[in-house]
Structure formats: C-alpha cells, structure tokens
C-alpha cells in the first residue's frame, strides 16, 4: 500500500488502541509479518501502522473503523501507513482475508461538523461535494439508522431567512438554496453573490440549517425543519410570475421561499417511507420538476387584435388559417367587447385606410399614411403602393420612392406585367441598371389591353339597340334574350380579333 497523506490526527485514546492492536498479543498479529518497534510521534504526524489494522475483524463482514473526531479545515497533520513486511508478506496477508472495499479519495468526501452525527453513521450532503461530482443520494431519518439508502431522494441543504425582512424572529420562513449544481438543476436560482449575502444573514439568526429533499422526477419536495426531530413537510413547486409575491394559496399560511420555483408547505405532514411504499407520491412526465404547460395558470391571451386583417376590416374570419380564432359568431360577446375596446382607444379604428380623394381629385388618398422603413414604398408592404396610389405628405415613410417623378417608380411601371414582378408581396426591388437589357417602350405605346371604357360603351350601345329592335318586332321574351346574346357574342368576337391583330397573332 502506497503512502498517502491524510488530514487530521488521532487523539490519545486512538494511540493506545493502535498500540494494543499492533502488539504481539493483539488480534492482528501474524506469524509471517514482523512488527516494527513503536514509532515516536511528532506533533503533526501520525505514527506508522500496518495495513492489517484496516483489514476486517470478521472475514464475512468487512468493517471500516470510523473517525470519531470530525475532520476540519484546521487539521493540517498527516498520517503515513505502510506494510512492515515485504511484498510477499503483503500478498499472504491479503490472501487470508477478503479484499478491502475500494475507498474514494478524501477530496470527494466531506464530513459535517455540527451537529455531531451518531458514532455508527456519517452524514454526507451533496452540496459539500466538489463541483465535478454528481450529487450524492442520501438516506433520511430512520433510513440512516437502518443503514439503507433510497435512490430516489436527493439532499439539498438550504439556509433560513425571514420572509418579511425582519431580523428578530426565530421562526424561519424562507429558504435560500446553496451550491446547487447547474447540470442537475431544473429551475433558475439567484446569483452566487445573493446566495452569499443571504447565507451570512441567515447563519446569524438560526444555527440549525433546513434540509430540503427533492424526489427525483417529482414535483414534491420534503423539508426537514429540525435535524433532531426530523419533521417532514410536503412542498410543492409553483411557477414564477410577475405577481409572484402576491401569489399565495388559500390553504397555505406561509411561503417557504420567494425564489423562482416557490416552495409552499402543505398543511399536513407526510411520512416519507409510508408514502413511498404505498406509491402515493405523484410522478411527472419527462422528469420535469414543474407542472406541465397546460396546467400552469398564465395571463389571459389576446385572441382579437388589430393585426388580424379580417377583424381590422370589421369582417368575420372565413376560411382562414388562424388558430383559436374568436372572430366568429360563436364568440360574439368577446368580439363585441374587443370592438368596443378598440373604438374606445381610437374612434377611427375600423374606418377604411384608403378613403375617397378631395373634391375634384380622382385618385384616392391614404387616411393615415404609410410607415415604411426599408422597402422604399415600392412593395406590397406599403399600403399606398398596394392601393396603387402615391405617398402623400401625411406618410411617415423613410427613403420613399413612390412619388410622381421617382425614376425607380417609372422604371418599375415601364416593365411588362410590373404588378407581377415588383408589386407582389415579398418581391425584391431591382435598380434601373438591372433593366438595361430589357426593351424600352415608347411613351405612346398601346395599352396592354384593348378593352377600354370606349369599347365597353360601344358594346353596351349595340346590346341596347338589339333589345329595342326585338321590342319593336314584338318578339317573345326568349327570342329577345337570344338576339341580345348573339349580339354580345358578335361584339366579343370583334374585340378578340382586334386584340390578336394588334399582337401579330392570327385567329383561326
């Protein structure tokens, strides 16, 4: 066994016990191992003793002798241990007794200093372990005395502070979590500086720390108020909202903490062992420590808002892709309340944005004006461009190009089918240099369609003349309709012939 430093030192009763065990009359004396003479002890060192002292007294049940004093930070001594015999003697000794259980490094184990644990057990808390170690699973209460541990319980030590900010009360009401590992936590906790400040204040008020036991994969947590009485209380996690300080249950008198994930004590005390055997503890799906999203009370959702085009125009939604829609007849009361609220804020909320122009002005005008920033008002994002009107002085747009003398607007309108290329929503504006290869059209070019108002008026005049002729001849109603439809077909055929001829197409 290699020499290894151990913190702390043994008291004088231990020195006498080691001397008695290693004496020739002791129970660990062996014929094949020569014992060394007693070593003189220095002030900061242990004496050298045999590994047989760490061996089992009974081969069927290995026993590890417990250190009576707690190992503290002030213990700076070291102990050295080595075999008195050679390698062959050590092999014979290990052959007689079963193997000693593998011991973890002392840096991975920490002992509690207060209160003093029983002589047969040592309590370990997960928060005292280094950060690279996973939280230890600890026994509670009677489980420690029985020597059994439960794999579903994790110990979380916390400190106590007053809920109302007072410093004179002796009854702790709030708990602040300390040293919770980030990879094991499922909720957010305050910063380390806040924890240090809270722990300093809490240690002055109460010397007995509170221990919270969280069931892995569960929403309930158990709290030990006093380490001597081991009282257990059921705790429930409550999500954090803006009004969390006022969020209290009626059957719960006092909150346990004001952190994210509020702990609220139940009115009854639970027996952990009995409930675990009976399976009374609830389980949580996916291992979350908070309730599911469907059960969390949240703020009311806004189901009717101005960004709905149907609602803004004063219509009901019909064949829309909206989810949880309330803009229908089934939610008439909610819709009426939303309309009343919108009109209370803005009396002109439901008026059309594109209104009629002034007297003598043929083109309509935007009532409020657009508010474009990066589109240049040459896309359907702009309400003025979508309505095929130019921006006016009431618009609040930046970098506007939708005005009469704009070269970009003229280039865009000179393109064939410009509404399909530059007017569609989401289309990209192309600068004039991109259209250098496109054919230029003269200003006196023919319109894209030959159906003008003059053509429509001429067609209607032909239909009226045919109707008057049928009336003069006293034709029946069916015959008069037939004559009018034949005249309409003749007019339409003439219009199409003219259209094809203008484009150089032949009509079969």
UniProtKB/Swiss-Prot annotation:
Q: Which GO terms describe its biological process?
A: cell differentiation; intracellular monoatomic cation homeostasis; male meiotic nuclear division; regulation of DNA-templated transcription; response to metal ion; spermatogenesis
Where is it localised?
A: Cytoplasm; Nucleus
Source organism per entry reads: Homo sapiens (Human)
Question: Which InterPro entries does the record match to this protein?
Answer: CRC (IPR005172), Lin-54_fam (IPR028307), Tesmin/TSO1-like_CXC (IPR033467)
GO terms for cellular component: cytoplasm; male germ cell nucleus; nucleus
Please describe what this protein does: Essential for normal spermatogenesis and male fertility. Required for the completion of meiosis in male germ cells.
This chain is encoded by the gene named TESMIN
Q: In which tissues is it expressed?
A: Expressed specifically in testis.
A molecular-function term among this protein's GO annotations:
metal ion binding
One Pfam family recorded for the sequence: TCR
In this chain, where does the modification N6-acetyllysine occur? 40
Q: Which UniProt keywords apply?
A: Acetylation, Cytoplasm, Developmental protein, Differentiation, Meiosis, Nucleus, Spermatogenesis
Name the PANTHER family for this protein.
TESMIN, TESMIN/TSO1-RELATED
Domain CRC per the UniProt entry, residue ranges: 292-405
Q: What is this protein called?
A: Tesmin
Q: Which family is annotated?
A: Belongs to the lin-54 family.
